[in-house]
Design a protein with these regions (language model features):
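Conserved P-loop NTP-binding catalytic core
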Residues: 40-118
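Extended helical coiled-coil dimerization/tether regions that scaffold
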Residues: 185-187, 191, 195-292, 296-312
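Electropositive, glycine-dotted interaction segments
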Residues: 90-207
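Acidic, Mg2+-coordinating catalytic modules of nucleic-acid enzymes
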Residues: 165, 395-408, 412-610
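Beta-strand elements of well-folded, non-transmembrane domains
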Residues: 25, 77-81, 128-132
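Switch/communication elements of ASCE P-loop NTPase nucleotide-binding domains
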Residues: 1-47, 270-399, 599-610
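Flexible phosphate/Mg2+-sensing switch loops adjacent to catalytic phosphate-binding sites
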Residues: 47-70, 306, 342, 367-369, ...
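Conserved beta-strand position immediately N-terminal to the Walker
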Residues: 24-27, 174, 406
Length: 610
């Protein structure tokens, strides 16, 4: 069994969302885009009560719920084996769910099976309202007969068939939250560990009873109250007690409360590396500590698989605290063993491990959450450019798409220069740069690698996923042609930037060097092994090094080491960032608006070097 669709209404920052989920999906997006909201909506629907914290006003959209405010989540579940409602009486009956049929290709539901709608499905709902007089949320889980006629689940005339937790346990939904640094996951203090022990093994009752007896009645000579340094204190206390109480109680010191529960609660996980000492989990690295919950859940999943039960696992940020090779191993293992995995991540490496149709970019604007696949379907014979973006450069593409704006430059060298300059600039920040002077481009603008000047193709792919694609082109006829190819797109690029007439990125680098021309020509000549008589000579040389990364990095380091060049580069990059982020109201002397090419939806600028 697995979840194929999720609808959310009125939950936290999301007023509405309709999300299609595959067997193994990764949710990618910037901070506060709604990834955790999706995961916790699933926990509300399918998780145990302890899996989700108590709902408050802030869980309702707008954080100020009135009597009519509702949280509503509806999930569609399919994957029943066999594909016949008669074999699943716990899900389908007059007192339970209504059978529906799902079309895997069209991703729609039907009341009856047909050539498209072939997979048996059921819909589960969760609703919540905030009771103002009691200052707490009232919740309900139920089977959904018909979304269109559902109405208010809390209405007096609403006749809903509630769903019991035991039925939901058949789906086997488990959540691994991003916060997983508790060091006692593998101990009897953990409910999950107790459940795994009950499922996969047996309680070590005999060993616990023996340990309890030893702790309760320690052998003579080992009792703490008889040890030097303590015996005098204990003896004096006993003398006082004899004088005060007829029963003359005697003080004894024990390591636990001496019942079975206290023995179990005192168990602490330890780990030994090779021949090294055995150390408690709290003395281990954070990576090992954070893996404990996953280790337990994998054992739980194995037990469910052995009995033919499904196992759906939602994992927030699996990349936390572990190295890239372990990230790949972990994610691949989860995808191989679970019926369904739902992963959230900020790591391009983790996101790139999922196929393009299962890489969902999450974005929330004005309360509407969208989840768009990177590309679905992927062409059977992708173009050379699509191969580079979707396969060879998927990490770079995913990383760029996580930004507020996405910039599509004319070529790979533009990407290399922008990244090199921004990195070198950031490495020369001072304490005074925390405010308006801080370099902002890399924070808010992601740059997509573009080969062979395939701006139109790249724009088509990016605009299908991201709401803020922009383009950067050279100031020549070819650049104008690339602009003409995308300006009629629907929607068009939000912002377009031209370099000056006849300029490419290399001219811009020479312009930055011109802030202290004589010193920079000498320094760059030494670093690059070529003397430069003037700025034009530097530009000509850089144009021959378009794909040579050492030149980009060396030149950027030299330039950003000079205060005048650093100030000029910061002015340029921050002005570019301002134009791309808010082209409607951007006002900077370095970029002038081209009114003849601009429209209400597309703002065109040209760089004007000062």
């Amino acid at each position: 069994m697995h979840i194929v669709r999720l609808k959310i209404s009125g939950f936290r920052g999301v007023s509405a969302a309709d999300i299609t989920l595959g067997r193994h999906a990764v949710l990618v997006g910037p901070n506060n885009s709604g990834k955790t909201t999706i995961i916790e909506a699933l926990a509300l629907l399918f998780g145990r009560d302890r899996l989700v914290r108590r709902l408050t006003e802030h869980d309702f959209h707008g954080s100020a719920p009135d009597e009519q405010a509702r949280i509503l989540c509806i999930a569609t579940v399919t994957g029943f084996t066999p594909n016949d409602p008669q074999h699943h009486s716990s899900w389908f009956s007059p007192e339970r769910g209504v059978e529906k049929w799902y079309a895997p290709n069209a991703k729609t539901l039907s009341a009856a099976p047909d050539a498209q709608h072939t997979d048996l499905a059921v819909q589960i709902g969760f609703a919540a309202r905030f009771v103002l007089d009691e200052l707490e949320a009232e919740t309900i889980r139920f089977f959904v007969d018909d979304e269109a006629t559902l109405g208010d689940p809390f209405a007096e005339d609403a006749h809903l068939r509630t769903i019991h937790t035991k039925i939901l346990q058949e789906l086997g939904f488990f959540l691994v939250p991003a916060s997983r640094t508790w060091d006692k996951w593998i101990s009897f203090s953990s409910e999950l560990f107790r459940r795994v022990v009950a499922t996969r093994g047996d309680m070590p009752a005999q060993a616990v009873r023996a340990e309890r007896a030893r702790l309760w009645t320690p052998p003579e000579g080992t009792r703490l109250e008889d040890q030097p340094g303590l015996s005098e204190i204990v003896g004096a206390a006993n003398d006082e007690l004899r004088a005060l109480m007829a029963s003359a109680p005697r003080l004894q010191l024990r390591l636990t409360s001496t019942d079975s529960d206290s023995v179990l609660e005192s168990v602490v996980p330890h780990f030994a590396h090779g021949t090294g000492p055995t150390l408690p989990s709290q003395r281990q690295g954070t990576g090992l500590v954070s893996l404990q919950s996953l280790l337990l859940l994998m054992q739980f999943g194995k037990a469910r698989a052995e009995t033919g039960q499904s196992f759906v696992l939602a994992v927030e940020e699996p990349e936390l605290h572990i190295q890239p090779s372990q990230q790949k191993r972990l994610v691949n293992r989860l995808n191989a063993l679970c019926n369904q995995t739902l992963v959230t991540t900020h790591s391009p490496l983790v996101a790139a491990m999922f196929p393009a149709p299962d890489t969902l970019f999450i974005e929330t604007r004005a309360g509407i959450l969208s989840a768009k696949p990177l590309m679905d379907p992927v062409p059977a014979q992708p173009t050379n450019h699509q191969q580079h973006l979707l396969f060879a450069w998927r990490q770079k593409l995913v990383g760029a798409l996580m930004h507020e704006c996405v910039l599509i430059p004319e070529g790979v060298s533009d990407v290399a220069w922008l990244e090199a300059l921004q990195t070198a600039l950031e490495l020369h920040q001072g304490w005074q740069d925390a405010g308006d002077g801080a370099p902002l481009l890399s924070t808010f603008v992601g740059v997509v690698p573009t080969i062979d000047a395939k701006i139109a193709d790249t724009f088509a792919l990016v605009s299908a996923v991201h709401a803020r694609p922009c383009i950067l082109v050279d100031g020549d006829n070819e650049g104008r042609g690339y602009f003409d190819a995308v300006k009629t797109s629907n929607p068009p690029p939000r912002a377009v930037v031209f370099w000056p007439q006849g300029w490419a990125m290399e001219h811009v680098v020479s312009w930055i060097a011109g802030a202290d021309e004589s010193a920079m020509l000498a320094a760059l000549g030494t670093a690059l092994g070529t003397p430069f008589a003037n700025a034009q000579a530097l530009t000509d040389h850089l144009l021959t090094q378009k794909s040579y990364a050492p030149t980009h990095e060396s030149a950027a380091i030299i330039l950003m080491g000079n205060a005048a060049c650093r100030a000029r580069a910061a002015q340029l990059l921050n002005a570019l960032c301002a134009v791309l982020r808010d082209p409607l109201s951007a006002n900077t002397p370095l970029f002038t608006r081209i009114a003849a090419d601009s429209t209400a939806d597309m703002h065109v600028f040209r760089f004007v070097p000062a």
